[in-house]
């Protein structure tokens, strides 16, 4: 049996999706955000370095503007996200402050990490914030990012963004919170006999084929993007845990080595009992 060893993990990227932050009613999940802030603050107090990649700008914007569904018009989508981003960061700042943890905002577009000079600048920004004991909260800059063939600046979704952030910050571990327990061998919402994969050492065609499906009405990420993100993590010699975000305190259990979710780690690096 492969044992998870996270004792030496110092720098952690945690990604939380819209489905974990916004209730099915469209209202903000205040309890979840409070739990997340508590966990991250606890980790910071223990000497860990934590970067939070947070979706939710669209969900927050829809709630504030009392809109029931995402606009189809791109300009309106960007406007709603812009409103929601301010509200989301305001709430994060208030709740983290209760736990005496300071946060900052970093909004990225894909072109920032493509060009060496801007990549160096954003890397330095991360390092400076971390050295000051601040939790960077990262999101895609939805108000200005586009997905045009001649000038693509979108990452696609925040699953991929979290993998990019983990790579450029040389994080020891990416923890991806989802609305599902991990990666299954088939869709658990359709097949009752679906089995959770506890460990994935390689992203095979079989795994890619079984990871179909889209995201929620508030978010964009599906299981396929999570698998593709794991592949990006592997390319950077990193590791990732995909787990259910229903109880953020489970992050602490994962770091203790408990076998929750799916652990993505290349097999040549796995330690055995």
UniProtKB/Swiss-Prot annotation:
Keywords noted in UniProt: Amino-acid biosynthesis, ATP-binding, Cytoplasm, Kinase, Nucleotide-binding, Proline biosynthesis, Transferase
Which positions does UniProt annotate for ATP binding? 15, 178-179, 220-226
The keyword Translocase is annotated on this UniProt entry: no
Q: Which Gene Ontology cellular component terms are annotated? A: cytosol
EC numbers on record: 2.7.2.11
GO terms for MF: ATP binding; glutamate 5-kinase activity
Pfam entry (one): AA_kinase
**SUPFAM superfamilies cross-referenced by the UniProt entry:** Carbamate kinase-like
Q: What InterPro entries does the record tag this protein with?
A: AceGlu_kinase-like_sf, Asp/Glu/Uridylate_kinase, G5K_ProB, Glu/AcGlu_kinase, Glu_5kinase, Glu_5kinase/COase_Synthase, Glutamate_5-kinase_CS
**Annotated positions binding substrate:** 55, 142, 158
Return the PANTHER family for the record.
Answer: GLUTAMATE 5-KINASE, ISOPENTENYL PHOSPHATE KINASE
The role this protein plays is:
Catalyzes the transfer of a phosphate group to glutamate to form L-glutamate 5-phosphate.
- What's the protein name? Glutamate 5-kinase
According to its UniProt entry, this protein's organism is Streptococcus pyogenes serotype M1
